[in-house]
């Protein structure tokens, strides 16, 4: 299969797309059904027998405006977040194309996939206007197929967290969240197409500050990264709360990635917060085991034709009396920096970028970049949607600075980002997902 640029490097050719097969084509609403589409009504609830439908709790209404366009003349609408799932035939990458809009009213829709991966941000349509958005969703199962030096088996998931609370990340379906935001917002979904595609994959490995957090108010830069890439590349987040480079090896998360990695794919990895605890336990340190385990990951990725990228761990929120961030992870950031230099690997210094970001906000306003599970409590390690969004921008800027191949797939509206001048926190307005928790992620 031949690949050409994402506007220069990575989009598949038309001949390659001809080999893709449409898994599903859905027409939402009670009106006439477009040829080749399956109708979805408000009462279409997901079941294993049906293989598609709304997840329980969806409060949706069907509207038919009539007209000559069966795809856009009717739709499913709601002023509350709702979820729609479709079972897919195999793990891998799928291009999802969604048609939004209403012939007679305004709509606003934010789309997230699986565990709150941000795919489309606040898509607005005026009355009579329709928008079609496309993005790539990566799906996976715990099973590991043999590939080269990788033996068959499965990822050692953490139950019940990964098997139940985070089950959408490991099941055989694509789950989409449609979120209208605050009143009087409303989402109007006209159609969805889901197509299996062969595109380059960017794998992520990391801890709770990287992984797809399933519940508000917690969020990570990994689940925001999808927002900043065109549909010529997939983001596959294999991070998990409470983990280390050693856990990545022991729980076979790296093996899972290597079993599906193709030449030219990328692995971006960031650990450190939990690795640091090995010092007190007497089981490791930054310039010994941590660096050695980074090397194990880099060597394995290169054996499989991948591109490794090392990211230093962002700082915690802890200010000194002068309003400067205290360096709580300096040794691990330096060890990551040394490993990247010695291994001649791309390096994103998120530790260095996080400090001016927090300091630009200051001791008080920086609280608004971190999760606040209760009115009087701030989690100074884990971020909220705003903090995760800004750190994702730091990572994207690092991808640009390293001139990585996937930089050509960065969305056009990104421009550049300087953590010294973050987006105004008061202007950030990403709709929150409906599920929340007061329990911190593992490894807090």
Regions found by a protein language model. Give the residues of each.
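N-terminal secretory signal peptides that target proteins for export/translocation
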Residues: 1-2
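Bacterial N-terminal signal peptides
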Residues: 5-15
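Compositionally biased, intrinsically disordered or flexible polar/acidic segments
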Residues: 19-215
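Conserved beta-strand scaffold positions in the cores of enzyme catalytic domains, especially
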Residues: 25, 235-237, 344-347
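Short, flexible loop segments at the rims of nucleotide/cofactor-binding pockets, characterized by
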Residues: 74-75, 243-248, 324-326
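Short, structured coil segments at secondary-structure junctions
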Residues: 113-114, 231, 304, 343
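Conserved SGNH/GDSL esterase-like catalytic core that processes O-acyl groups on lipids
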Residues: 170, 179-187, 195-204, 209-300, ...
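Alpha-helical cap/lid subdomain in secreted, periplasmic
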Residues: 252-412, 420, 431-444
């Amino acid at each position: 299969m031949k690949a050409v640029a994402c506007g220069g490097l990575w989009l598949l050719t038309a001949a390659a797309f001809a080999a893709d097969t449409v898994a599903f084509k859905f027409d939402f609403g009670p009106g006439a059904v477009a040829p080749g589409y399956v109708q979805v009504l408000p009462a279409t609830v997901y079941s294993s027998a049906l293989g598609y439908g709304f997840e329980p709790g969806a409060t949706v209404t069907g509207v038919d405006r009539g007209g000559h366009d069966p795809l856009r003349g009717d739709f499913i609408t709601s002023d509350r977040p709702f979820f729609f799932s479709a079972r897919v035939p195999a793990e891998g990458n799928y291009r999802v194309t969604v048609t939004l809009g209403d012939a007679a009213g305004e709509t606003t829709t934010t789309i997230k996939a699986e565990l709150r991966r941000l795919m489309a941000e606040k898509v607005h349509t005026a009355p009579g206007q329709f928008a079609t958005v496309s993005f790539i969703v990566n799906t996976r199962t715990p099973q590991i197929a043999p590939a080269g030096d990788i033996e068959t088996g499965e990822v050692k998931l953490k139950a019940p967290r990964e098997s139940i609370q985070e089950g959408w990340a490991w099941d055989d379906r694509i789950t989409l969240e449609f979120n209208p935001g605050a009143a009087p917002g409303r989402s109007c979904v006209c159609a969805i197409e889901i197509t299996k595609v062969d595109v380059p994959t960017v794998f992520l490995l990391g801890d709770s500050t990287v992984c797809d957090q399933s519940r508000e108010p917690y969020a990570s830069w990994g689940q925001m990264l999808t927002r900043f890439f065109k549909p010529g590349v997939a983001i596959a987040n294999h991070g998990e709360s409470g983990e280390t480079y050693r856990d990545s090896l022991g729980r076979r998360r790296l093996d899972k990635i290597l079993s599906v990695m193709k030449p030219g794919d990328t692995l971006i990895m960031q650990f450190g917060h939990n690795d640091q605890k090995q010092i007190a336990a007497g089981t490791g340190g930054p310039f010994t085991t941590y660096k050695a385990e980074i090397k194990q990951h880099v060597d394995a990725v290169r054996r499989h034709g991948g591109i490794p990228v090392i990211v230093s761990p962002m700082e915690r929120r802890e200010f000194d009396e002068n309003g400067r961030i205290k360096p709580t992870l300096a040794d691990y950031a330096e060890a990551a920096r040394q490993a990247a230099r010695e291994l001649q690997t791309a390096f994103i210094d998120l530790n260095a970028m996080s400090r001016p970001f927090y300091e630009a906000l200051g001791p008080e306003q920086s609280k608004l970049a971190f999760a606040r599970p209760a009115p009087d409590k701030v989690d100074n390690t884990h971020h909220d949607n705003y903090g995760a969004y800004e750190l994702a921008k730091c990572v994207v800027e690092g991808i640009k600075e390293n001139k990585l191949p996937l930089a050509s797939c960065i969305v056009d509206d990104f421009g550049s980002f300087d953590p010294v001048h973050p987006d105004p926190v008061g202007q950030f307005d990403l709709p929150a997902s409906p599920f929340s928790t007061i329990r911190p992620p593992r490894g807090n």
